[in-house]
Amino acid sequence: MNNWERMKAGRLYNADSKDLEQYHKFGMETCDKFNRTPLWRKKRKQRLLEKLIPSAKDGGAAIFAPFYCEYGVNIHFGKGCFVNYKCTFLDCAPITLEDGVWVGANVT
């Protein structure tokens, strides 16, 4: 089991390992693109969000920028979730929000 698999499983892993670098870079870069995309480019914002957090597809989540996370793929949304401005999700372990969960502004 590599460090990526260990991290996703919530097990002990080496955070400095080279095998995590590509995933971390992807998450940080995609988050940055999402945050810099203007509000009026809704389709682009949604595509970036779905790329970062696959469970955000089909109305799984609405997120107001700025939004920050480390990997994205470790975040799981139920239907109809909402995340307000300036939230930070440290998703080195799985984060799951059930259906209808709303997260207030400035939450970490």
Regions found by a protein language model. Name each.
Residues 1-60:
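Terminal amphipathic alpha-helical/low-complexity segments used for targeting or macromolecular assembly
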